From Swiss-Prot:
Its main location: cytoplasm. PROSITE patterns: EFP. One of its GO terms (cellular component) is cytoplasm. It is found in: Cytoplasm. It comes from Hyphomonas neptunium (strain ATCC 15444). Involved in peptide bond synthesis. Stimulates efficient translation and peptide-bond synthesis on native or reconstituted 70S ribosomes in vitro. Probably functions indirectly by altering the affinity of the ribosome for aminoacyl-tRNA, thus increasing their reactivity as acceptors for peptidyl transferase. This is Elongation factor P. The keyword Cytoplasm applies. One of its GO terms (biological process) is peptide biosynthetic process. The lineage of its organism: Bacteria, Pseudomonadati, Pseudomonadota, Alphaproteobacteria, Hyphomonadales. Belongs to the elongation factor P family. The gene is efp.
Amino acid sequence: MAVEIAADIRRGNIIEHTDGQLYVVLKAESFRPGKGTPTTTIEMRRISDGIKVVNTFKTSEKLEKAFVEEVEHTYLYPEGDNFVFMNSANYEQVTVSGAMVGDGAPYLQENMPVSLQMFNGDPVSITLPPRFTAEIVETEPVVKGQTASGSYKPAILENGVRIMVPAHVGVGTRVIINTEDGTYLERAKD
């Protein structure tokens, strides 16, 4: 285990908390008030049971960061509430719980390359590619003259995810989505 100060903890890090459990960091934000002690608020998910917790630490407080191995895998198929991935190097299959995949589940596509973080040979976290391409299947019709405005409208993708898209984007358009926060990035160029 490596020791890191709270201010250096980032999304995706695996830390061992004071209760002896491993947690994956979902979000870490530092706050530096004009007066008082700077703090870091860390939102994390306990690996053993998937429970989310939010803790606030002094930015100089030391936390134990677990050594995890990044292993490239390929997504194969869903299996009930779980997902099956194949190790790209040795072709071994690994089953990952739906709780671990979390909000990224709708973005999984067959043969999609992902990175699994492994701790003692077990998957503890997953990293999806930063971009996902999908087709819009439902949205309001395109209104002439709104191509340059900053207004957005709701749309539903082929995987069922609801997003906000610019007013000029219509049904059948392929768009690129940010997998971290589910926001529209741009039209696909294919």
